[in-house]
């Protein structure tokens, strides 16, 4: 029989830099999970993606064991890296803060495709383009 899931915890952590300090410690500690075991596994799995924030979904079982699934970095983080900017525009209607080209847009869409609710690359590109536009980043051909 499969183990019963007691909780599902969602966190967004720096790749390769998880430590027992908040937010990891309190979130896992209240469910009785071995915090250091999670930190070591997460850091080992994400060390090649340094510099990105990687969302993680942790399933905690009734025997206090856990499994976790890492997601792709948020689209906004990928767009800001591609455009070479610190952050998006506060008011996207008035100010453009950067530009990305179609090739960069397609690369981001390919990266995000497993986590998006899309079946093909064209619709994924439209989703990412909308996110970029809302951040004040224009897409050039």
UniProtKB/Swiss-Prot annotation:
Disulfide bonds: none annotated. GO terms for biological process: translation. The keyword Repressor does not apply. GO terms for cellular component: cytosolic large ribosomal subunit. Keywords: Methylation, Ribonucleoprotein, Ribosomal protein, RNA-binding, rRNA-binding. One or more lysine residues are methylated. InterPro entries: Ribosomal_uL11, Ribosomal_uL11_bac-typ, Ribosomal_uL11_C, Ribosomal_uL11_C_sf, Ribosomal_uL11_CS, Ribosomal_uL11_N, Ribosomal_uL11_N_sf. Part of the ribosomal stalk of the 50S ribosomal subunit. Interacts with L10 and the large rRNA to form the base of the stalk. L10 forms an elongated spine to which L12 dimers bind in a sequential fashion forming a multimeric L10(L12)X complex. Belongs to the universal ribosomal protein uL11 family. NCBIfam families: L11_bact. Forms part of the ribosomal stalk which helps the ribosome interact with GTP-bound translation factors. This is Large ribosomal subunit protein uL11. It comes from Prochlorococcus marinus (strain MIT 9211).
């Amino acid at each position: 029989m499969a183990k019963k899931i007691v909780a599902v915890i969602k966190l967004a952590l720096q790749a390769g830099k998880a430590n027992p300090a908040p937010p990891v410690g309190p979130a896992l500690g209240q469910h009785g999970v071995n915090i250091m075991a999670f930190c070591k596994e997460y850091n080992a799995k994400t060390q090649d993606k340094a510099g990105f924030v990687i969302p993680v979904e942790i399933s905690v079982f009734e025997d206090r064991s856990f499994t976790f699934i890492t997601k792709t970095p948020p689209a906004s983080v990928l767009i800001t890296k591609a455009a070479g900017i610190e952050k998006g525009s506060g008011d996207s209607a008035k100010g453009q803060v950067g530009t990305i080209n179609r090739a960069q847009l397609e690369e981001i869409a390919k990266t995000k495709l497993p986590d998006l609710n899309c079946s093909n690359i064209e619709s994924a590109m439209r989703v990412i383009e909308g996110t970029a536009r809302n951040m004040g980043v224009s897409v050039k051909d």
